[in-house]
């Protein structure tokens, strides 16, 4: 059995990753594939926490751009992440992996409220913990949620699984054929050069708490495990 490099991780999934090629909604085949990859690392005795975005169902910024109150639009986005989290939980439990959804906004009929000590206890019992509803506050992204929860639970690394790119580039590789992929970066590089890794709030939080970040593609099956056992994939961001 491969030896994992990291004991406790936060896996950040974009909402789009759950939509697959259809671009929106929840694709059952894709979410089952992701659940199988999570099962692989759970079987290595890695403690797994997951933060899921909601962009496949709703984006707060889009609503705001269309004239909605920004806070209302963001709360709708938080509810979208709960839907995604419940779908992922169902897929994991179909595969026999015990999991818990914890929400930043209380909705006790469908999930536990977020309690840090309880989340850590679940992880110690090798249950997958899915953090839903963002930070519970408008104006904060799910990237910031991943950084915040990683700091709170003292995760060893954040694995940022992308569905449309396999690392961090100096330009958009979909538009610029000469774009170069970085093997490694510092958070100061990300902030200084305005690289689209995660928003500046999330990057600053990771930098201040010395949490490394690996950006990689979720589209190639087995990549989550490769990242966990320390294979060189994607781009690693760390330090100042």
UniProtKB/Swiss-Prot annotation:
Pathway: Pyrimidine metabolism; CTP biosynthesis via de novo pathway; UDP from UMP (UMPK route): step 1/1. GO terms for molecular function: ATP binding; UMP kinase activity. Allosterically activated by GTP. Can also be activated by dGTP and 3'-anthraniloyl-2'-deoxyguanosine-5'-triphosphate (Ant-dGTP). Inhibited by UTP, 5-bromo-UTP and 5-iodo-UTP. The keyword DNA-binding does not apply. GO terms for cellular component: cytoplasm. Its main location: cytoplasm. ATP binds at residues 12-15, 55, 59, 163, 169, 172. One of its GO terms (biological process) is 'de novo' CTP biosynthetic process. It comes from the Bacteria. Keywords: Allosteric enzyme, ATP-binding, Cytoplasm, Kinase, Nucleotide-binding, Pyrimidine biosynthesis, Transferase. It is found in: Cytoplasm. The keyword RNA-binding does not apply. UMP binds at residues 54, 74, 135-142. Its EC number is 2.7.4.22. Changing residue 135 to A: Loss of cooperativity with ATP. 5-fold decrease in affinity for UMP. Increased sensitivity to activation by GTP. Homohexamer. Interacts with BrxC. Catalyzes the reversible phosphorylation of UMP to UDP, with ATP or dATP as the most efficient phosphate donors. Is also able to phosphorylate 5-fluoro-UMP and 6-aza-UMP. Belongs to the UMP kinase family. This is Uridylate kinase. It comes from Bacillus subtilis (strain 168). The lineage of its organism: Bacteria, Bacillati, Bacillota, Bacilli, Bacillales.
């Amino acid at each position: 059995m491969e030896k994992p490099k990291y004991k406790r991780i936060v896996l950040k999934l974009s909402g789009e990753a759950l939509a697959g090629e259809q671009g929106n909604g929840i694709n059952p085949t894709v979410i089952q594939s992701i659940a199988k990859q999570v099962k692989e690392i759970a079987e290595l005795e890695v403690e797994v926490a997951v933060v899921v975005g909601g962009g496949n169902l709703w984006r707060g910024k889009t609503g705001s751009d269309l004239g909605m109150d920004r806070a209302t639009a963001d709360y709708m986005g938080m509810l979208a992440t709960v839907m995604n989290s419940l779908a992922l939980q169902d897929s994991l439990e179909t595969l026999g992996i015990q999991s818990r959804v914890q929400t930043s906004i209380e909705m006790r009929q469908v999930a536990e409220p977020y309690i840090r000590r309880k989340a850590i206890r679940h992880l110690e019992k090798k249950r997958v913990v899915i953090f839903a509803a963002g930070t519970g506050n408008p104006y904060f992204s799910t990237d910031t949620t991943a950084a915040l929860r990683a700091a709170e639970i003292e995760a060893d690394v954040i694995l940022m699984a992308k569905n449309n790119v396999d690392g961090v580039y100096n330009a958009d590789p979909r538009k610029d054929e000469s774009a170069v992929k970085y093997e490694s970066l510092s958070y100061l590089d990300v902030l200084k050069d305005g690289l689209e890794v995660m928003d500046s709030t999330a990057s600053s939080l990771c930098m201040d708490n010395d949490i490394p970040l690996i950006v990689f593609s979720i589209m190639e099956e087995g990549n989550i495990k490769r990242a966990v056992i320390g294979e060189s994939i994607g781009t690693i961001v760390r330090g100042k």
